[in-house]
């Protein structure tokens, strides 16, 4: 099995875990420069997922490591969100993490 297939297989294994935990992240407000709470949540989730090493660096980024082989795979993503704006324009609470028809709704759920 090549690396791409291994990654896809592992992602499939973690699909339910991801679906359970994405709403937790959506429920945690993480406006720009206020990401500490969601960073701590991500650390907990990565530890629960079995990462060998997880920490928050000096810039507030979550760093996680699995294994220690010669090959490296890096993921880079932002964990902040922008303000909600007018809450009356939302069809649901933007921090509810509501799941409807298999889709998680809320601020930051899709990017």
Please identify what each model-predicted range represents.
Residues 2-107:
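Acidic/His- and Gly-rich active-site-bordering loop/insert found
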Residues 110:
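Loop-rich non-cytosolic ectodomains and luminal regions
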